[in-house]
Design a protein with these regions (language model features):
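Flexible, polar/low-complexity N-terminal or interdomain linker segments that lie immediately upstream
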Residues: 206-273, 279-281, 357-371
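Inter-heme linker and motif-flanking segments adjacent to c-type heme-binding CXXCH motifs
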Residues: 25-29, 53-55, 100, 115-130, ...
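Extracytoplasmic electron-transfer domains, predominantly the class I c-type cytochrome c fold
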Residues: 62-113, 154, 160-210
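Sequence/structural segment immediately N-terminal to covalent heme-attachment motifs in c-type
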Residues: 29-50, 77-79, 129-150, 173-179
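Alpha-helical scaffolding within the catalytic cores
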Residues: 76, 172, 295-302
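N-terminal export/targeting leaders of redox proteins
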Residues: 1-32, 104-110, 369-371
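Catalytic cysteine-centered active loop of the rhodanese-like fold, especially the PTP/DSP P-loop
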Residues: 298-347
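Electrostatic cytochrome c docking/interface patches
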Residues: 21-38, 114-138, 249-252
Length: 371
């Protein structure tokens, strides 16, 4: 049995025999792998899970599936971490784009994910030759329920994501369909589909590609330098500072609906809106008036006044990391806090006011919510 990689380092002493016999101790992880473990735990485990098995928030995929690791090149994983998956909860973590990770930190995460995994396979190069129309029929019948459509996300990886399709090879996609992602719900389709049908599906998935929009780059007007942890606050923290307090009705004593928040803004009620995502996400799209308070840096909350003003946090999960921010605020004694229930993309879909980077592509509709 393979132990989850994050837990393996912690339990190695417990695996030693109890007979008193001498046993050669396992070498400690290299500094690079240890750095990757710590970096992963801080930034990635929230959604992908402590053991990288995925599906903790927003259906973040497993990063430990053998069929993923044996087919995903370092370059592909690096692009996924650095550029993210725009329109989803997977942020761009590269410091160049306003995220918290420099290139060595990204490489350390990759080294950590590779620990105990299979060797990288040499997959065929070049495009897959398939029939797009036939592939759509197969996709609609077998894949769309989990993977969605270009305009609607669902419970699994959104295969129409432009950055995914710009960085994934046809061979990577073909291997995923053929071999699945054990032990996740993505089953192997080899046998259920013929090789020609798999080629057709890959051709159809590839046909959904559109050129990804250029990411919003930090500038002197937004951040001090590319690796700055937070955009400096040029606007007010408190919106409508002379307004009355809103009268929210919370679900489960935690969640406030986007409709209530929009009405409070329309009524000029006093409140604070905190974006719990990475600054790179804030740069690309945020609710008008929101400040950047990334979930991994509680220092970002220090300037928020603790005077009874309502503080509303949001994210794209739709409310996992924003829940962490609200939990921290409540721990500090803030009396009026809530999570914006449906998240940023439902807010955008409702055509409520946002600040978006020039050229930002419309996000696919988020999947149905589950508390």
């Amino acid at each position: 049995m393979r132990l989850p990689v994050v837990l393996a380092f912690a339990v190695l002493p417990a695996l030693a025999p109890a007979t008193g016999c001498a046993r050669k101790s396992e070498p400690p992880p290299s500094p690079l792998i240890e750095k990757g473990r710590q970096t992963y735990a801080k930034y990635c485990a929230t959604c992908h899970g402590p053991a990288a098995n995925g599906y903790i928030a927003d259906n973040a995929p497993s990063l430990r599936s053998a069929t993923f690791l044996e087919s995903a090149s370092d370059e592909f994983i690096r692009a996924g971490i650095s550029r993210g998956r725009p329109g989803t909860a997977m942020a761009a973590f590269a410091s160049l784009l306003g995220g918290p990770l420099d290139p060595p930190a990204v490489d350390a995460i990759i080294a950590f994910l590779r620990v105990g995994g299979p060797a990288l396979r040499a997959l065929p190069e070049g495009p897959v030759v398939g029939d797009v129309k036939r592939g759509k029929v197969v996709y609609d019948a077998n894949c769309a329920r989990c993977h969605g459509t270009p305009t609607q996300r669902s419970s699994a990886v959104h295969l129409a994501n432009p950055v995914l399709l710009a960085t994934a090879t046809d061979a990577f996609l073909h291997w995923a369909v053929e071999r699945g992602r054990p032990p996740t719900s993505m089953v192997p389709w080899k046998g259920a589909l013929t090789p020609v049908q798999i080629d057709d599906v890959v051709a159809f998935v590839r046909s959904m590609a559109v050129p990804p929009a250029a990411p919003a780059l930090p500038s002197a007007m937004t951040v001090a330098k590319p690796s700055a942890p937070l955009p400096p606050r040029k606007g007010p923290i408190v919106l409508n500072p002379r307004g009355k307090a809103p009268e929210f009705v919370l679900k489960e004593d935690l969640y406030v609906s986007i409709a209530q928040v929009k009405k409070a803004l329309d009524d000029k009620r006093r409140l604070i809106i905190a974006d719990a995502r990475t600054p790179s996400d804030w740069l690309n799209l945020h609710i008008t008036g929101a400040i950047s308070t990334p979930y991994y840096d509680t220092r970002s909350l220090d300037d928020i006044p603790n005077d009874g003003t309502w503080v509303l946090a949001y994210c794209a999960c739709p409310h996992h990391v924003s829940g962490e921010v609200v939990a921290e605020l409540r721990k500090r004694g803030y009396k009026h806090t809530a999570v914006i229930d449906e998240g940023i993309y439902a807010w955008q879909q409702a055509k409520y006011p946002v600040v978006a980077a020039p050229g930002l592509l419309p996000a696919a509709a988020p999947p149905p919510m589950h508390h």
